[in-house]
């Protein structure tokens, strides 16, 4: 298994995982406009994606969007888009991918917003500092 940062040349493989993730959680599949916006964001460096590969197969991905936090007055990242193909789960891929994304993104901390049912998984992966509630504003 190899883990590396993804770029816009990987958009087809990444899009397969994005679509599989949305299907697994019961959301509508994203369309071509969303794909184009994602490719543009990757191209412009507004989001960093990392991928786990088994030979030529992209088997897992995650993203880190960097910002600055007064939590520790250093670069921080929002960890999202985490998906491991079902047949590769519980094999260490997730842990390696999280560790790689943290190291390579250059952030001093990463936060994740997740469903209650996913809290034990994220805690097992090292997300252990509770920061209260995470709410999204949609304007």
Summary of predicted features, one role per range:
Residues 1-16:
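A short beta-loop-alpha structural element at the N-terminal edge
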Residues 15-39:
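Conserved GNAT-fold acetyl-CoA-binding loop/helix
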Residues 39-51, 78:
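A short helix-loop-beta-strand connector motif used in the catalytic cores of GNAT acetyltransferases and
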Residues 51, 57-66, 78, 83:
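Conserved beta-strand in the GNAT
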Residues 67-79, 89:
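A conserved beta-turn-beta hairpin within the catalytic core of GNAT-like acetyltransferases
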Residues 84, 90-103:
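Conserved acetyl-CoA-binding loop-helix of GNAT-fold acetyltransferases
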Residues 105-115:
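Conserved GNAT acetyl-CoA-binding A-motif
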Residues 123-133:
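Conserved acetyl-CoA-binding loop of GNAT-fold acetyltransferases
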């Amino acid at each position: 298994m190899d883990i590396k940062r993804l770029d816009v040349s990987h958009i087809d493989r990444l899009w397969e995982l994005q679509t599989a993730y949305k299907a697994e959680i019961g959301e509508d599949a994203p369309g071509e406009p969303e794909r184009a916006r994602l490719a543009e964001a990757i191209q412009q460096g507004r989001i960093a994606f990392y991928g786990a590969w088994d030979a030529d197969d992209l088997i897992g991905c995650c993203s880190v969007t960097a910002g600055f936090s007064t939590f520790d007055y250093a670069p921080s990242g929002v960890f999202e888009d985490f998906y491991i193909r079902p047949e590769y789960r519980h094999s260490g891929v997730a842990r390696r991918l999280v560790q790689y994304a943290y190291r390579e993104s250059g952030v001093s901390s990463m936060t994740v917003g997740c469903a209650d049912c996913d809290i034990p998984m994220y805690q097992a992966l090292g997300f252990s500092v509770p920061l209260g509630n995470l709410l999204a504003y949609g304007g």
